């Protein structure tokens, strides 16, 4: 009966791999109706989930007893997607009513899937405000599988500071093998195949089972192959001749042609490598070590001699060179498991030009490419069978005849750790042995699977090196060390730097530094190279809002909403567009739409709160900022928004507390320090306010907002000359800001220089003839500065000399000064 089920299951997986979800669902329903097994249940639920019907998968699994780990994990995943967090936790760890399972229990139960299970459980804990337990789950997940990125990302976002050097490393062989199930346990099997039969071993998918049974190519004791879920970068020549086996140091038997060949490295992506040996890379198969003294890249790759099988005498051998069939920039461990290329293998093969009855190929089942970050295989076959196994996302055997391999000149390598192709001899050639082994009288044979594993581990180490650098940059960004983040990410290899994700992080860093011109430049580059990217575009839209670029913002919002109407980023961009046009009611509707699309999107709540502030609906604004904090307690923009509202309500102590909370999250923000200084001065802490403003100016020496407020505090403390010096410097930064000239006039009035005071008041009127800044002056706290006795000029009376010169931090967004202190960070 099992044999009859396998073709149906194979057809289902083939439909899934080709995104034919309706066909997959239909066939899976037929299979489950025929066979009410746990495997068929899981397959049907998988079809529902992949087709975007998580609620169907949830109800199906919920209505049946889920005993296998794979069904439990999928059910918990559905619960999380449907916001049933408590139920998801109950399924994975036992919940609050039952005895909770420890991490070790979860590892024992879920096996290779434990890293994903712990990551999902950590997400549940963080969403339910149990950050400590969530952090433990994320860290355990990373220790089990350092190829995962999202747990590290989540740790950074909740305020933890994981060490990338300790996180992204292959600590042991066991650690590496846990990411690649059974990578080094698959044995070499030798098959005597007739001439022109395929001499390859391919990992089978359900749809390939029958053909593989016919060819009898599956190793009887091999449950998995290295290509568990993906065929990423592969050797399309299908064979590596016996003389391709790596040799020990200095043991190569080289032909004259090989010795004269220039030493080159060949990329696993095709074409010569342009990267230096120290460049973090994981798509490079080096054909020589970087330098005679540096064998670290592939250390221990070929430290033991190899026994080389060769062709019979007189049989010219067609040698193949290990090369990549893929082109472009795809590399090892980077693709999904749904590609359909033929999976490569390492095969020791000889082909005679004359009739040859049989060969004895040395077949290596584990290939050198496998994505450790892909989902691990199911722990057992969907249908038990002695003759074959059925696996997900493997590659289809399409080769009916062996490929014709043209004669090639061999690539050689003379240094330690490389691939060497000796010339063909009439008999078995044994390479020179390591001196230590010779002295002991021992001969050790390097098996092909160990060689493949070492190659694989070297590629994985390259990926680890890249992840460490990216992790350092992302950690610095989440800690708001923006300059450090920019420096780290800018030194990534160019092909990684010029990607949307990296550039978005750099653009966000410039945005946090209030360097909006630089941020716009970076984000525009993102739009050029990845016009389909939506993530991060909400920051780009706010950048354009700050720069008052209404046309570019309109184009961006139109493109995003046309591309993805279910994206909160698109509606945030549309809201910013109308906010810039001062159509606040429409902007509010768009921000509310963003929240409707994703209720857990904190930035949409923050933008909505700022719009309510502009329409003087402070109670609604307070609710929005509190919701943003509920969704993301580390969203410092919302803490700032609360402080701003309390300042407007003259609740200065509450304002200072909330500004300080925002500063604790983002200690590098000069704008937050500036606002704290303003509140401290309002609380009659003038000296402390000056110290705070000085710190802000140290962080950002050219921040006009900080310098203006420091000048205002100096003026209030009757330090007129210091205030005048500060204002003269500020005038060079913002030469068209009327408030600066107005405060200079106030200073000259106090110094008794009436003619200079009149001149500056006149300039202020010229820069602001319609009195647009009167809205600011009307909102100024009269306690901030002492009132003047009498206005000395008509201009000063019009400008409101009895008012303080401090900005209200909220209004008149058409001035340069306000742009620097905008509500929207």
UniProtKB/Swiss-Prot annotation:
GO terms assigned for molecular function: protein phosphatase binding
Modified residues (Phosphothreonine): 205, 209, 313, 367, 431, 447
Domain of life from the UniProt record: Eukaryota
PTM statement from Swiss-Prot or TrEMBL: Phosphorylated. Phosphorylation on Ser-427 and Thr-447 occurs specifically during mitosis.
Keyword Repeat among UniProt keywords: yes
Disordered: region residues: 306-423, 782-825
Bias (Polar residues): 326-341, 363-372, 381-391
Phosphoserine: modified positions: 291, 339, 380, 387, 427, 436, 439, 822
SMART domains per the UniProt record, alphabetical: TPR
BP GO terms, sorted: anaphase-promoting complex-dependent catabolic process; metaphase/anaphase transition of mitotic cell cycle; neuron projection development; protein branched polyubiquitination; protein K11-linked ubiquitination; protein K48-linked ubiquitination
Pfam families: ANAPC3, TPR_1, TPR_8
Pathway given in the UniProt record: Protein modification; protein ubiquitination
UniProt biased composition (Low complexity): 349-362
GO cellular component, one term: spindle
Keywords noted in UniProt: Cytoplasm, Cytoskeleton, Nucleus, Phosphoprotein, Repeat, TPR repeat, Ubl conjugation pathway
Localization (cell): Nucleus; Cytoplasm, Cytoskeleton, Spindle
Biased composition (Basic residues): 396-414
Placement of TPR repeats on the sequence: 6-35, 38-65, 67-99, 115-145, 465-495, 499-528, 533-563, 567-598, 601-631, 635-667, 670-702, 704-734, 737-768
Gene3D superfamilies the UniProt entry points to: Tetratricopeptide repeat domain (1.25.40.10)
Primary site of residence: nucleus
Family listed: Belongs to the APC3/CDC27 family.
Function, as annotated: Component of the anaphase promoting complex/cyclosome (APC/C), a cell cycle-regulated E3 ubiquitin ligase that controls progression through mitosis and the G1 phase of the cell cycle. The APC/C complex acts by mediating ubiquitination and subsequent degradation of target proteins: it mainly mediates the formation of 'Lys-11'-linked polyubiquitin chains and, to a lower extent, the formation of 'Lys-48'- and 'Lys-63'-linked polyubiquitin chains. The APC/C complex catalyzes assembly of branched 'Lys-11'-/'Lys-48'-linked branched ubiquitin chains on target proteins.
Known partners and oligomeric status: Homodimer. The mammalian APC/C is composed at least of 14 distinct subunits ANAPC1, ANAPC2, CDC27/APC3, ANAPC4, ANAPC5, CDC16/APC6, ANAPC7, CDC23/APC8, ANAPC10, ANAPC11, CDC26/APC12, ANAPC13, ANAPC15 and ANAPC16 that assemble into a complex of at least 19 chains with a combined molecular mass of around 1.2 MDa; APC/C interacts with FZR1 and FBXO5. Interacts with RB. Interacts with FAM168B/MANI. Interacts with MCPH1.
PANTHER family assigned: CELL DIVISION CYCLE 16,23,27, CELL DIVISION CYCLE PROTEIN 27 HOMOLOG
Protein name: Cell division cycle protein 27 homolog
Gene name per UniProt: Cdc27
